[in-house]
Design a protein with these regions (language model features):
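Secretory targeting signatures
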Residues: 1-39, 520, 538
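Blade/loop signatures of beta-propeller domains
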Residues: 33-66, 259-267
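Beta-strand-rich domains and repeat architectures in extracellular enzymes and scaffolds
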Residues: 48, 71-99
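Beta-rich, blade/repeat-based domains predominating
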Residues: 75-86, 119-140, 172-186, 217-230, ...
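Conserved beta-strand positions in repeat-built beta-propeller and related beta-rich domains
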Residues: 92-96, 129, 146-150, 191-196, ...
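Short loop/turn segments that connect beta-strands within beta-propeller blades
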Residues: 104-108, 158-162, 203-207, 250-254, ...
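Blade-level signature of beta-propeller repeat domains, shared across WD40, Kelch, NHL, RCC1
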Residues: 391-430
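Long beta-sheet-rich domains in secretory-pathway and surface-associated proteins
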Residues: 427-538
Length: 538
């Protein structure tokens, strides 16, 4: 692992960049505001063969008891970043049109705002433009900010004026750049540069920006970030080989010292403001980061089904696992998939809970760290072109790449189904679960039995769902079959008010000593409800 030298200096560039003068897309020899240009009609940019994969396979939005989808009026917009205003209005970026759009949950009406700079650029280039816009946030001055990786730009859309302005994201000539997630923090706009290996903090005032770029400690990816109650920024810095660190950056102290150093014309050194912690086993691509209840740091790993907590006091990581994806998500028409994974992508804190999008499970998970209960809501639309679905009718994923939390509602985008949707977590659940123990200690080769009790909330379940099987759910953080789980039955009916199931939990004779999490519960087509128990092998 190559580590940056300790003598790195923060490049605090007080550039006073005017938003109105920002360059949207650099096109040599032509102005992006040239009104004499012939408008280039690019369409959606996909061939007939490509269109089902990227634009959607379902003409209508779908719904469940907990999830409602809404079809975007313009075809093939490929929605990605999403946020909400305090009044509940939903905003999202369209990666295949260059526009942003809003959705009014009360009227269920979409409004899409044409980006004239994008249209002009397509006309000049005579080609379709497309960009992954990963980050979006609302600022209290009535604007929507979002990132644009294709043009290395940050956009600001004025809600009152309905106008787009942009600035160029600071880049180095010899390093690629990918502005990704974006957070408004007071008068600052914070953006991580995923491939450029830095955080950039823009200070916004009176239509101008100054910025400071904070280099990462390692030459590698700089992913998502979160701010704790003491104004520390936590973010991950990692390499594709799975090595990396969790970084704690003293944001408050840096801001204070930055003002002093600017006046004294001196530099600031990275090592004076950071602490870092080596990744635990199993963490390979930690994209999403959040500060949860009790100020613990939560991280999701996109190469697996794992998510982790980090206690800043004890400096210890704890590994958790989502449910195993259902076969509807991955298909397995070829028969080659032996260990399907859910790929949790981003994670956010909301009240007592944490919310994560499970990309390849086509679910949104809501985890309560206090009770260690995980509720996973199934997204009803599926696109078979992203999974092993040949010959399978209902199969695939909608590529839910982003979500935004507004009270009890979780809004999300479906990148390949041209939908936005909402999970209503206020709706009562169809059943509850209880496990007779929360902790188990096993010797190697030992087996014990725990009792899983499922209580049906029959008033919340339709007659059809009562007849459909409910399945026992289980997964574990252990590897190499160190722990095996065997329920006495695999499915049951919610017709019974209470169903009691014995579950064998066994430690292999060759298991390594250690502490693991085991997830037990039940699931239907629409929802999974589970709880963790802690298993220690001695």
């Amino acid at each position: 692992m190559k580590t940056r030298k300790k003598g790195i200096i923060f490049f605090a560039l007080v550039a006073g960049i005017m938003l109105a003068s920002g360059i949207t897309i650099a096109i040599p020899g032509k102005s992006s505001e040239d009104n004499d240009l012939e408008v280039f009609v690019a369409g959606d940019g996909y061939t007939d063969d490509e269109r089902p994969q990227f634009c959607g396979t379902n003409d209508k939005a779908k719904s469940t008891d907990f999830v409602t989808e809404f079809k975007i009026p313009t075809a093939c917009t490929q929605p990605l970043a999403i946020t909400t205003e305090p009044n509940g209005t939903v905003w999202f970026a369209q990666t295949n049109t260059g526009n942003i759009a809003k959705f009014d949950p009360l009227t269920e009406k979409f409004t899409e705002y044409t980006n004239p700079r994008w249209v002009a650029a397509e006309s000049q280039l005579k080609q379709k433009l497309r960009s992954m816009m990963w980050g979006m946030d609302y600022s209290p001055d009535g604007a929507i900010w979002y990132t644009d990786e294709a043009t290395d730009s940050i956009w600001r859309f004025s809600i009152a004026d309905e106008t787009y302005n942009t600035i160029n994201f600071p880049i180095s000539e010899d390093i690629s750049s990918l502005p990704q997630k974006l957070v408004i923090d007071g008068s600052n706009v914070i953006v991580n540069d995923f491939t450029g290996g830095k955080l950039t903090i823009f200070s916004y005032s009176q239509d101008s920006l100054s910025y400071a770029s904070i280099p990462s400690a390692l030459d590698g990816f700089t992913s998502d970030f979160a701010i704790d109650s003491e104004n520390n920024i936590w973010y991950t810095n990692w390499n594709s080989d799975g090595t990396g660190i969790l970084i704690k950056f003293n944001y408050k102290e840096w801001e204070s010292q930055l003002s002093i150093s600017s006046q004294a014309d001196s530099g600031l050194f990275l090592q004076d403001f950071i602490q870092f912690f080596q990744f635990p086993s199993g963490m390979a691509a930690p994209n999403g980061v959040s500060v949860g209840p009790n100020q613990n740091i939560w991280i999701v790993d996109t190469t697996s089904s794992y998510f982790f907590s980090f206690d800043p006091v004890t400096e210890e990581f704890t590994k958790y696992v989502t449910s195993v994806p259902t076969i509807d998500s991955y298909g397995n028409a070829s028969g080659f998939i032996k260990s399907p994974i859910s790929r949790p992508y981003w994670i956010e804190h909301s009240g007592d809970n944490l919310v994560m999008n499970e990309q390849t499970a086509n679910r949104i998970g809501v985890f309560n760290p206090s009770t260690e209960t995980l509720v996973e809501y199934t997204i009803p639309s599926r696109n078979p072109n992203w999974s092993d679905c040949e010959g399978i009718e209902y199969c695939g994923v909608a590529q839910v790449f982003d979500f935004a939390i507004d009270g009890k509602k979780i809004w999300f985008t479906e990148w390949v189904e041209n939908n936005i949707g909402v999970v209503d977590t206020s709706i009562p659940l169809p059943f509850s679960i209880d496990i007779d123990t929360k902790e188990i200690t096993l010797e190697k080769g030992e087996t014990t039995v725990v009792t899983l009790q499922v209580t049906s909330n029959r008033s919340m379940v339709s007659a059809l769902e009562l007849l459909l099987p409910t399945n026992v759910n289980y997964s574990t953080t252990s590897t190499f079959s160190d722990i095996t789980i065997k329920p006495e039955l695999n499915d049951f009916s919610l017709l019974s008010e209470v169903t009691t199931i014995s579950v064998e939990v066994a430690a292999s004779e060759h298991a390594l000593s250690g502490t693991h999490k085991v997830l037990l519960g039940a699931y239907t087509n629409d929802i999974a409800i589970s709880q963790f128990i802690t298993v220690t092998i001695v």
